[in-house]
Amino acid sequence: MSVTAPLGFRAAGVAAGIKDGGQRDVAVVINDGPHHSAAAVFTKNRVKAAPVQWSQQAVADGQVRAVVLNSGGANACTGAAGFQDARTTAEHLAAALNDSADRIVVCSTGLIGERLPMPKLLAGVDAAVAEAARDGGLNAADAIRTTDTVSKIAFRRGSGYTIGGMAKGAGMLAPSLATMLSVLTTDAVLTPEQCTALLRAATEVTFDRLDTDGCTSTNDTVVLMASGASGTTPDEAEFSRLLTEVCQDLCRQLLADAEGATKAIAIEVVGAASTDDAVTVGRAIARNALFKCAIYGEDPNWGRVLAAVGTTDAVFEPDNINVAINGVWVCRGGSVGDDRAKVNLKPRDVTVTVDLSAGSASATVWTTDLTVDYVHENSAYST
């Protein structure tokens, strides 16, 4: 179950011919209410795609009726014409739903710099609306894939309500948000203000800490829609926990499907002076090509970890840093620790723990190894 697990939502994914080979490439997620509270977070890349620019305006009043998504083209760096294409897409879906275009979020993913084939896209929107149903969540999740090899879906049951979600992303995964489109839905009764606060809290500790290749997309969008169809006003603490779990579940799936990856790496930074320091250190390690290559080669090279830590302005004393790789403390006090031969890097899941010995704050950042397959895939992405 996916975005249609909560009551009040319909979805569909169809093949409109934007991508080759008859693959699904247009999706809609429709909120049939009775409420339409919503919030969204977007890329912090200053080069924002046209659908991001449109959707930032659309979600500003906290009311969203539907989301339309396409894969096969990012509609980024396409100028005023690209923005008009995003507007036209919103207007087209709004007309089909007898609603207003300023209540439609538009998302696109794919190659940057090319206009979308609008006749195909609009025909796809019509087909998706016609097919939209309570069991359409899986097809919708399939339609937003680009280099993803599998669809990503998740849901959780709360006390009288449900939270569902879908996401896409396999490359350009880096804060803010990681390269992703994600639609989250709930049938809980929430205000727009609650949606905003809860979504930001969840993404801050999940999507924002997924960093596979240091490349921030132009199109990142995560939107939360609340239909209120369950009639349940949730306990905020419980809802926040479950929403974070859904986002974390999707993050794990994104990490598992990252382009060319053979290892899923959790970088746990503890003993930091602040959470910001912990995140900064985690990101520095996650983006260090030498470290990522070492993990690919199953080499527990803790020196590369320390070298990455040293590039940050986090508070620490080099002689107080400890590093463990898969539970073996290979570095103690900034120098040689336990026998690195004890480290088993055969499993796909790898945990690197860095103790800065500078405080009590902590954070985890997720990344992958750097592989030959990643280079091959991204050297031929547009050809």
Curated annotation (Swiss-Prot):
One of its GO terms (molecular function) is L-glutamate N-acetyltransferase activity. InterPro entries: Arg_biosynth_ArgJ (IPR002813), ArgJ-like_dom_sf (IPR016117), ArgJ_beta_C (IPR042195). Pathway: Amino-acid biosynthesis; L-arginine biosynthesis; L-ornithine and N-acetyl-L-glutamate from L-glutamate and N(2)-acetyl-L-ornithine (cyclic): step 1/1; Amino-acid biosynthesis; L-arginine biosynthesis; N(2)-acetyl-L-ornithine from L-glutamate: step 1/4. GO terms for cellular component: cytoplasm. It holds the Pfam family ArgJ. Keywords: Acyltransferase, Amino-acid biosynthesis, Arginine biosynthesis, Autocatalytic cleavage, Cytoplasm, Multifunctional enzyme, Transferase. It comes from the Bacteria. Substrate binds at T146, K168, T179, E259, N378, T383. Its EC number is 2.3.1.35, 2.3.1.1. Transmembrane segments: none annotated. The active site is at T179 (nucleophile). It is found in: Cytoplasm. It catalyses: N(2)-acetyl-L-ornithine + L-glutamate = N-acetyl-L-glutamate + L-ornithine; L-glutamate + acetyl-CoA = N-acetyl-L-glutamate + CoA + H(+). One of its GO terms (biological process) is L-arginine biosynthetic process. The record marks T109, G110 as: Involved in the stabilization of negative charge on the oxyanion by the formation of the oxyanion hole. Catalyzes two activities which are involved in the cyclic version of arginine biosynthesis: the synthesis of N-acetylglutamate from glutamate and acetyl-CoA as the acetyl donor, and of ornithine by transacetylation between N(2)-acetylornithine and glutamate. PANTHER family: ARGININE BIOSYNTHESIS BIFUNCTIONAL PROTEIN ARGJ, ARGININE BIOSYNTHESIS BIFUNCTIONAL PROTEIN ARGJ, MITOCHONDRIAL. Heterotetramer of two alpha and two beta chains. This is Arginine biosynthesis bifunctional protein ArgJ. It comes from Thermobifida fusca (strain YX).
